[in-house]
């Protein structure tokens, strides 16, 4: 099975070390463009663009990278409760059309009540997933070309429709990650690819089996992906030394502050990440070559595969054997590590190198009439 390898655009900051200004660098458009172009040339399938108040806006960043890349896809966040499904569907179709079918979407429900309140969202965990399920149903139907009337608990639309369809049919693929039962149910019923953070393989296997069974109950099959950091070097010793350097400027106070911030979230996945290290520096290798040091101060994906190319490739293939076909990777700093992964790791894997998409012909059309419909030629009788 060929593997889809993704990279990451660090719109929330980048540098040589975690938890410090030491070795950091400005993250401006030129730097993000360098990373995107490197990923494009090296054969990555796409890039994940993060979302949240600590990040630049993912949609604007993605749009700005379209003209400077050729085949790279952009995995961009959909934010239920923050954006209406109709507006999000229009944005999705436009991004897909402007990129010639290079748009992918990542459903993000949110997990930090403090940040959500700042965005005007006051739903609890269960309510957010209810809203996300309704949002996704409407979003998908709109991209399928339906005119939608929907009266749910959280979402109400009447006569919603898109005038401009996406390039990818039936719609651009929808990614999603969540560890709670309600999150897995949403994934099983509505998404195309279920993402998990990089837990030890035995825990990932349990998740995949649970989601696969839930999807089968809905008569569906979905794909699987994993989100990981990577520290790959020419030798295993060099890789482990690089891992230690990454956290060499971290102090206990910074770790404690980060863990306190993570503790206020209601994300089951974040709780599972924190349990892998319990906020302590010792015993960070939680599974062979799987290191939890990143999660001491970084929210979300907090583990890294560490080793030389053949070693890391063997661990990736262990995940692939569980049914995972997509790997969303990152490393610090992201420009240099994009090259290291491409040069030291890719030769040891069966990597699916994307082709440059051919321009898709679009039907000619006149200006929309009354902001309501596209004029079509009428056959003369």
From Swiss-Prot:
SUPFAM superfamilies recorded for this chain?
Bacterial luciferase-like
Keyword terms of this UniProt record: Flavoprotein, FMN, Monooxygenase, Oxidoreductase
Catalytic reaction annotation: an alkanesulfonate + FMNH2 + O2 = an aldehyde + FMN + sulfite + H2O + 2 H(+)
Q: Does the keyword Nuclease apply?
A: no
GO molecular function terms listed in the Swiss-Prot or TrEMBL record: alkanesulfonate monooxygenase activity
Role according to the record: Catalyzes the desulfonation of aliphatic sulfonates.
HAMAP family tied to this protein: Alkanesulf_monooxygen (MF_01229)
- Please give the subunit comment from the record: Homotetramer.
Q: What family is this protein classified in?
A: Belongs to the SsuD family.
Q: What else is noted?
A: FMNH(2) which is absolutely required for this enzymatic reaction, is provided by SsuE.
The name of this protein is Alkanesulfonate monooxygenase
Per the UniProt record, the source organism is: Escherichia coli O81 (strain ED1a)
